[in-house]
Amino acid sequence: MKNQVIYQIFVRNYSKEGTFKKVEEDLFRIKDLGVDIIYLMPIHEIGVGQRKGTYGSPYAIKDYFSISPDLGTMDDFVSLVNKVHELGMKIILDMVFNHTSPDNVLIDTHPEYYFYKNGKRGNRVGDWTDIVDLDTNKEEVQDYLVSVLSFWCQKGVDGFRFDVASMIAFPVFLKARQALGNDVIFFGECIDHEFGNYLKNINSIYVADEELMKVFDCLYNYNWMHQMIAYLNKKGNLEDVIKAIKEDNPINIRVNCLENHDNSRFTSYFNDESSYREWVRFTYALNGYAFIYMGQEYGIKHKPELFEKDPVIWDKNEEMFNFYKQLNFKKHEQMDIKQDININDGLIFLNEKAFKL
């Protein structure tokens, strides 16, 4: 599976309509781009209680077995899945198992599934008003979450992207892998080392990358991504970026992400397109998966809002699209080899190929 291309879609803001049907209509273009795996952000019904914004966060889920009615019906979703498969691609769903909305259906049926602080449902870390944490240490919670995954596998999905996987009790993933088999894709959102150390210090759940990789196919590159963003914001140095990449590469298979729904558009860090393209080339040259957030393939600068209806404005820069298309083609031919990365005279050398970053 390595050296494939993942394409992230926020269905609500993918089009003016914000529906599965509009995504399905665009699948030929996505296939032409060279995408292997389509990753959908959460598609479930969103909680109303303490909702943020008009539409709410897709990560504040009311019912894991539901479809948000704004996006379409279950039949629409299954049609999308079938079309993805017909075109030779795979599709994975975002699963949010660390927390739910405060009015999730489990609140009434299984209040014991939740984490309590001072007698009240709450969060282990932070104080987010639109979510409450599940207690994933409990076996009954683990079994329930595995049943959620089984349900969506029966609908035809090929795997899952797990939100904040590092903060979910590891037996959830062990049980899921045992129940679903090795062919189901497990893509994990891990956390950077600094936040991981904080979680350990407060005795919260923290699963290290090395542990996650016992059952996961791939993890985000957040450790070096955050170093890169600091460098581009003139708050860090290139040596720290390279150090983080070297630390990641021997252990894990990374999804080399430059932008997503949590971060600014990568184009926003650059005044000239040539520097932007050089960073993209470098990222593609690294071992692991390539990652594109909807619109990135055109160099779009506007990042859709998470809590509102804010569709992508498809300003189609065909030259940029072809740039990504060519990189995706090369990615598929790329061989995994031990990567030698060094800095010399202001240039990054990756296996003797120079990048001016």
Residue ranges and their predicted role:
Residues 1-2, 48, 52, 215, ...:
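Loop/helix patches that line or flank the sugar-binding groove of alpha-linked glycan CAZymes
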Residues 1-35, 43-155, 173-181, 185, ...:
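Substrate-binding/active-site clefts of carbohydrate-active enzymes
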Residues 12, 41, 67, 163, ...:
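Conserved residues at the C-terminal ends of beta-strands
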Residues 19, 69, 73, 137-141, ...:
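Residue-level preference for long, well-ordered alpha-helices that form the structural scaffold
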Residues 36-38, 158, 290:
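Short acidic/polar active-site loop segments enriched in Thr and Asp
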Residues 44, 97-101, 166-168, 192, ...:
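Active-site-proximal loop/turn and secondary-structure-junction residues that shape catalytic pockets
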Residues 147, 163-249, 254, 282, ...:
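Active-site-proximal helices and loops of the catalytic beta/alpha 8
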